[in-house]
From Swiss-Prot:
SUPFAM superfamilies: S13-like H2TH domain. Residues 93-118 are annotated as: Disordered. GO terms for biological process: translation. Belongs to the universal ribosomal protein uS13 family. The gene is rpsM. GO terms for cellular component: cytosol; small ribosomal subunit. The keyword Cytoplasm does not apply. The lineage of its organism: Bacteria, Pseudomonadati, Pseudomonadota, Gammaproteobacteria, Pseudomonadales. This is Small ribosomal subunit protein uS13. Gene3D superfamilies: 1.10.8.50, 30s ribosomal protein s13, domain 2. Located at the top of the head of the 30S subunit, it contacts several helices of the 16S rRNA. In the 70S ribosome it contacts the 23S rRNA (bridge B1a) and protein L5 of the 50S subunit (bridge B1b), connecting the 2 subunits; these bridges are implicated in subunit movement. Contacts the tRNAs in the A and P-sites. HAMAP family: Ribosomal_uS13. InterPro entries: Rbsml_uS13_C, Ribosomal_uS13, Ribosomal_uS13-like_H2TH, Ribosomal_uS13_bac-type, Ribosomal_uS13_CS. Part of the 30S ribosomal subunit. Forms a loose heterodimer with protein S19. Forms two bridges to the 50S subunit in the 70S ribosome.
């Protein structure tokens, strides 16, 4: 297994699909990485040379991925909560942030139903 950005990439899958195993790299980004490095997206990782894998590593390193991306997202959410803005309050209360209705639905965000106390 090749290791790119601290993630073990599966050998028996196509390059584009394997790159999506990295947090922060989707299909579109993986295709762009393959295009800039000149690697054929249909070739499997096990068939790539060490030089090509190094090129992929270098190109992936230009993007914010894995732990850095997770940290960045959490810091942005924390900043909203510290500001006390509407979106921050919604995050703090565990409710939908982007204007969805909550009278019905929103069960995923709110969690399981709580029984009514008498």
């Amino acid at each position: 297994m090749a290791r790119i950005a601290g993630v073990n990439i599966p050998d028996n899958k196509h390059t584009v699909i394997s790159l999506t195993y990295i947090y922060g790299v989707g299909r579109t980004t993986a295709q762009k990485i393959c295009a800039t490095t000149g690697v054929n997206p249909a070739v499997k990782i096990k068939d790539l040379s060490d030089e090509q894998i190094e090129q992929l590593r270098g190109e992936v390193a230009k993007f914010t991925t894995e732990g850095d991306l997770r940290r960045e997202i959490n810091m942005k959410i924390k900043r909203l909560m510290d500001l006390g803005c509407y979106r921050g309050l919604r995050h703090r209360r565990g409710l939908p942030v982007r204007g969805q209705r909550t009278k019905t639905n929103a069960r995923t965000r709110k969690g399981p139903r709580k029984p009514i106390r008498k």
